[in-house]
Regions:
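Outer-membrane beta-barrel transmembrane domain signature
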Residues: 12, 109-113, 132-138, 142-237, ...
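Transmembrane beta-barrel domains of outer membrane proteins
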Residues: 17, 29-31, 51-53, 64, ...
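Transmembrane beta-strand segments that form the barrel wall of outer-membrane beta-barrel proteins
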Residues: 26-34, 58-66, 88-92, 118-129
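Solvent-exposed loop/turn segments connecting transmembrane beta-strands
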Residues: 36-42, 97-100, 126-137, 193
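Short glycine/proline- and aromatic-enriched beta-strand/turn motifs that initiate or cap beta-hairpins
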Residues: 5-58, 251
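Glycine/small-residue-rich interface belts in oligomeric ring/scaffold proteins
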Residues: 48-79
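Outer-envelope beta-barrel architecture signal
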Residues: 18-24, 42-46, 67-73, 101, ...
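Transmembrane beta-barrel strands of outer-membrane/channel proteins
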Residues: 24-32, 75-79, 121-127, 139-141, ...
Length: 255
């Protein structure tokens, strides 16, 4: 689970004026999420909102049309906080972990079948650095419903993946850690691959021109090597998250 993500995505109510070069949305809000991947304990963290709706560099590139249609591209980032074994019953013997940061790109493609209905698919890949290093990312698809001009609803399946280095950091148990746990945690050497599958839902309301109320909720189920880790004895394979935030779209004329 990530503290937040930035993505290029368009909204039916947002359309660039002829002189606009960039439509950038910025905001923030609280996110309730597991305190670490696989945890049954939850925490509240700040979740930034950064969306690139439109970018036009004359003579070079134009991305986004202000609708949920066509190709979108933008930044994607994530953050995993510290994990202290002494804070979690059942993890005694494991080494403490520092924070991991993730930075990468998100690609998406959207279709609009009617003013009220649409769909989108997306993928994102990020490089993780800090405590863990490696490649992480996700895939997903959404059905889109617009009951009014100011309200957009999205719902669909998701999946995430991670490379060996990342999975090893958060789900392995070394021989030394197994001994330190008194044998409560077996030695475990996981491998990279798909990490979770789940469902996500989003609601987005424009309550004033260029001002938005954003809500999100999701469920992830740990799978593969992550789900088989002895660390799951101290947590849960089922992961939930809920978030809400306020954002504003800024229009910039740079070129």
């Amino acid at each position: 689970m990530h503290i937040g993500n930035a993505a290029a995505q368009e909204d039916v109510r947002i359309a660039p004026a002829p002189e606009t070069d960039i439509l950038l949305e910025l905001g923030v809000g609280p996110l309730i999420r597991p305190s670490f991947e696989g945890s049954s304990q939850y925490e509240i963290v700040p979740s930034p909102i950064i969306r690139l709706h439109y970018l036009n560099i004359p003579g070079l590139i134009e991305i986004g049309q202000g609708l949920d249609t066509g190709l979108s591209i933008g930044p994607s980032f994530g953050y995993t906080g510290e994990r202290k074994a002494t804070d979690v019953p059942g993890l005694y013997g494991l080494e403490d972990l520092d924070a991991t940061y993730e930075l990468g790109l998100r690609l998406g493609y959207g279709w609009s079948f009617a003013p009220e209905y649409g769909a989108e698919v997306y993928g994102e890949a990020r490089y993780a650095f800090g405590e863990a290093t490696g490649l992480v990312g996700g895939l997903g698809a959404n059905g889109i419903f617009r009951p009014t001009q100011s309200l957009t609803l999205k719902f669909g399946p998701t999946a995430t993946f991670a490379s060996n280095g990342y999975i090893d950091t958060y789900f392995s148990v070394s021989p030394q850690e197994s001994i330190a746990s008194g044998g409560a945690l077996d030695i475990y050497d996981p491998s990279g691959g798909f990490k979770t599958v789940g469902l996500s839902a989003e609601a987005r309301l424009e309550f004033q021109p260029s001002w938005f109320l954003n809500g999100q909720a999701g469920y992830d189920r740990l799978i593969g090597s992550a789900a088989d880790s002895p660390i799951m004895q101290a947590g849960s394979r089922d992961q939930l998250y809920f978030g809400i935030g306020i954002s504003k779209v800024f229009s910039l004329d740079l070129f």
